[in-house]
Amino acid sequence: MELVSIIIAAYNCKDTIYATVESALSQTYKNIEIIICDDSSTDDTWDIINKIKDSRIICIKNNYCKGAAGARNCALKIAKGRYIAFLDSDDYWVTTKISNQIHFMETEKVFFSYSNYYIEKDFVITGVFSSPPEINYGAMLKYCNIACSTVILDRTGVKNISFPYIDKEDYALWLNILSKGIKARNTNLVDTYYRVHAGSVSANKFKELIRQSNVLKSIGIKAHHRIICLFYYAINGLIKHCFSYRDKRNA
């Protein structure tokens, strides 16, 4: 059984971090290490994570705020697992998440996998998002339907994992990986709870479009090509929110 390193970047998340960590500890797949990097929180986050006693947890703290990319990269530097899983500090998993996804990756010979997820708002499940069955670089330029908390990477195929220091850093990393010819595959399971907060950046569609453009510019996509990609991104965003969410009663 290969070691899975679970990376959690935490910043001022005292109300959600306990449930997040507990969902990682409750995995049926037992060969895990959980690396939590507190990004210089100003609330009780650090105290809460240090009260969770389990030998599989490694807690580190940044002396100053480095952002989500910096916190994840600090955790990645000490990760020992063949597999790297990401879990945002306000999301959580079903207990079989890791076990099922590793089985899928080993069986299908996949280096980059992701899954579908529940949408939770104000502690109520409002729907389910189904990601595409497979995503390559060209498709990823036009939309990002991969939630960070659903991803597991195999370091035997994905080398030198590091988040770029830019807004939408997870999307930028996925593009970097896929640009090398690797394809991302969906397990087709719904195993992650993605929490949406009022006023969050990902919920603000105008800001999201600007961030999308900045990522494309940072990787050298020319202006005319960016416009085309952003057009598709906007259309896909509309389709995503109108048609891709299934009512929770049908999940």
Swiss-Prot record:
CDD domains, A to Z: Glyco_tranf_GTA_type
Location(s) in or outside the cell: Cell inner membrane
Cofactor: Mn(2+); Mg(2+)
UniProt cross-references to Pfam families, sorted A to Z: Glycos_transf_2
Record bears the keyword Transport: no
Coiled coil (residue ranges): none
Family: Belongs to the glycosyltransferase 2 family.
One GO CC term on file: plasma membrane
Pathway stated in the Swiss-Prot or TrEMBL entry: Bacterial outer membrane biogenesis; lipopolysaccharide biosynthesis
Source organism per UniProt: Escherichia coli
Protein name according to UniProt: UDP-Glc:alpha-D-GlcNAc-diphosphoundecaprenol beta-1,3-glucosyltransferase WfaP
Activity-pH behavior: Optimum pH is 6.5.
Enzyme class: transferase
Record GO biological process: lipopolysaccharide biosynthetic process
